[in-house]
Regions:
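Short helix-capping/hinge motifs at transmembrane helix termini and TM-loop junctions
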Residues: 46, 114-118
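Hydrophobic alpha-helical transmembrane segments
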Residues: 68-81, 105, 153-156
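N-terminal transmembrane-helix/juxtamembrane module of multi-pass inner/ER membrane proteins
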Residues: 6-78, 129
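Juxtamembrane loop-transmembrane helix junctions in multi-pass integral membrane proteins
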Residues: 14-17, 58-65, 88-91, 140, ...
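Membrane-embedded catalytic cores of phosphoryl/pyrophosphoryl-handling enzymes
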Residues: 135-191
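Interfacial segments of alpha-helical transmembrane regions
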Residues: 80-113
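Membrane-interface interhelical connector segments
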Residues: 118-142
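Aromatic-anchored segments of alpha-helical transmembrane domains
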Residues: 35-36, 104-112, 180-191
Length: 191
C-alpha cells in the first residue's frame, strides 16, 4: 500500500511540475479538434473526388518500411513536446495553442476544399516493419488515403520542435533531439 501511495505522490508531483492545471484544457482541446478534423473531414469528403497528389518525387523515393517506427513514435513525441510547451509560461503556451488550432482549422478548410489522395507503394515483405506499415495503412484509409495535403504530421512535428526551441527550461540536448526527430518524422511521411 505504501508503494502505491508513493507512486501516486510521484505521479502527482510530476504532473504539477510539467503539466500545470491551466494547460490541461487547451491540450485536450487540441487532441479532440485534431481527431474531429482528421476523421470528420474524411467523412465529409468520402463521396467526393480526391485529387491524386502523387508526384514524381513520390515515385522516385523508395519505400523504407523501417521508417514506420519513426512515424508511430511521432505520437508520444508530440505529446511530450506539447506538454513541455507549457514550461515556457502561460502567455507563450497560449500563443502556441492558438497557432496549433489555427493551423488545424486551416488544414480542415483545405481538406474540405481540396480532398487529396496518393498512390501508396505495394508492401511485398512480411517483416515486423512491413506488417506494422500494413496496419497503419489499414487504419489510415487503406489504398485510398486522404487528408494528405497539407501534412498534419509535418506541421505538428515542426511545431513540436518550436515548442521547446530556445527554451531556458528545456535542456539543450533535448532541443537538438527534437529538431532531429521532427525532421525524421517529416522524412517518414515520404519514405
Amino acid at each position: 500500500y505504501a508503494y502505491r501511495l508513493n507512486m501516486k505522490k510521484k505521479f502527482e508531483d510530476f504532473i504539477k511540475k510539467y503539466l500545470p492545471g491551466w494547460a490541461i484544457l487547451p491540450l485536450l482541446t487540441i487532441v479532440v479538434l485534431n481527431c474531429l478534423i482528421y476523421w470528420g473531414s474524411d467523412q465529409l469528403t468520402s463521396a467526393r473526388y480526391h485529387y491524386d497528389f502523387t508526384g514524381t518525387l513520390d515515385r522516385m523515393v523508395p519505400l523504407v518500411p523501417a521508417f514506420i517506427w519513426i512515424y508511430i513514435l511521432a505520437f508520444p513525441f508530440w505529446a511530450v513536446n506539447y506538454i513541455l510547451a507549457a514550461q515556457r509560461g502561460k502567455d507563450q503556451f497560449y500563443r502556441f495553442v492558438a497557432t496549433d488550432l489555427t493551423i488545424h482549422l486551416t488544414c480542415f478548410v483545405i481538406f474540405l476544399i481540396l480532398p487529396t489522395t496518393n498512390v501508396r507503394p505495394e508492401i511485398t515483405g512480411n517483416s515486423w516493419s512491413e506488417q506494422m506499415l500494413q496496419f497503419v495503412y489499414a487504419m489510415d484509409g487503406g489504398n485510398s488515403p486522404s487528408n494528405l495535403f497539407p501534412s498534419i504530421h509535418c506541421y505538428v512535428s515542426w511545431l513540436s520542435w518550436r515548442s521547446v526551441h530556445k527554451s531556458e527550461k528545456i535542456p539543450e540536448w533535448y532541443q537538438h533531439f527534437s529538431l532531429i526527430f521532427a525532421i525524421l518524422i517529416i522524412i517518414s511521411t515520404q519514405v
